[in-house]
Swiss-Prot record:
Record Pfam families: KH_dom-like, MMR_HSR1
Gene3D superfamilies: 3.30.300.20, P-loop containing nucleotide triphosphate hydrolases
InterPro entries xrefs: G_ENGA (IPR031166), GTP-bd (IPR006073), GTPase_Der (IPR016484), KH_dom-like (IPR032859), KH_dom-like_a/b (IPR015946), P-loop_NTPase (IPR027417), Small_GTP-bd (IPR005225)
Keywords for this protein: GTP-binding, Nucleotide-binding, Repeat, Ribosome biogenesis
Record protein name field: GTPase Der
KH-like domain span: 365-449
Binding site for GTP 2: 194-201, 241-245, 306-309
Quaternary organization: Associates with the 50S ribosomal subunit.
Residues binding GTP 1: 9-16, 56-60, 119-122
PROSITE patterns linked: G_ENGA (PS51712)
The species this protein was found in: Bradyrhizobium diazoefficiens (strain JCM 10833 / BCRC 13528 / IAM 13628 / NBRC 14792 / USDA 110)
Amino acid sequence: MSFTIAIIGRPNVGKSTLFNRLVGQKLALVDDLPGVTRDRREGEARLGDLEFTIIDTAGLDEGAKGSLTARMQEQTEAAIAQADALFFVVDARIGLTPTDRAFADFARRANKPVLLVANKSEGKHGDAGAMEAFALGLGDPIQISAEHGEGMGELYDALAKLMPEPVEEDEDEDDAPLSEEEAATRPIRVAIVGRPNAGKSTLINHLLGEERLLTSPEAGTTRDSIAVEINWKGREFRVFDTAGLRRRSRIEEKLEKLSVADALRAVRFAEVVVLMMDTQNRFEEQDLRIADLVEREGRALVLAANKWDLMETKGGGAISGLRRDADHWLPQVKGVPIVAVSGLMGEGIDRLMQAIQDAYAVWNRRVSTSALNRWFEQAVQANPPPAVSGRRLKLNYITQTKARPPSFVLFCSRADAVPQSYLRYLTNSMREAFDLPGTPVRITLREKANPFAHKRKRPS
């Protein structure tokens, strides 16, 4: 069982900076504005030879009952209940505030080991605030600078006394080549994206069976890409809920820009992307832009038509209408899976999870060279390539170079002369022949070398 630590404290004391330092990459948004982190988020952390799970939380703050701030506090309380130990973080430059003192009592009542961390201790101004932290009665403050990496040795010494002896384990490298068996058992990385307030967090909360992610009628409740583990019928999924992707003209605040960048990183890290659309306002310009981004990044795509419970007309006719719209507006991912869901009511969840698993299998698919070239001969015979500048194009053969997504190289006589329309014909024909709906298909043109090009001409 992994040792788990929750980082707690009032807003803007540097909790997310410490989280990023321990995880080793920027998984949490960091800014000078209070309350940047809204949900609790987890990561696998390392400090020297110590390995543990770390939870970053929203800043402890007092808010009206039922307000978003109050629910942020509930998320923090849930993280404390899950943790084996706590990092209570204070700002050494500012010193103690009444909020620090109030929530120090809160931390003591948790009955968990607490390490008092005086962050932002670099320079002369940090010493006074760190000394002031003694008054909290949580032991000696550990002076660090999460931003600059100072004091990590002292934090290591204190944490090592709390943790059990580490157990040696073999670790799979995340980017190591996978066998078919490994690909079938490894957690599928899924990013759930969409416009703000499309219902992304509500859907994940229903999958988890708990309010792990904050939800609100206010657009933009989620700010970070939040990763959660889900087991569905014995299959593991790592699901990223993301900040809503808005039109660029509406991204005004600095924090909003950080959130969108975080969502884009989640798309690039994912293997399957679920684009959630409001059923009553589907295929708006921003939906199409997001789908195009997913295709360009080479990720498998699944469309989730959310709020299906609000539709007046349901059934096969409504789904067929969705399919026609999708094929019209998204020809680059023709046949993309579409699932009608209600994140609030829990309708369509099983179908969505199966669609994700199917899309992942298609994204990983390899086609044998013999089957590929049998199809290729038939496709070219049925619709030969056009003549360009009075010369017939010669298409030689095709081979698959990789999966994830399926990528192919087509050898031909003049690569720059093959029309894009003919390339689209081959792509759509291949999708139909090998059942590759919705996943990006890459066909790269390459000229076949002329074996006689470099031979000397015989003397006459």
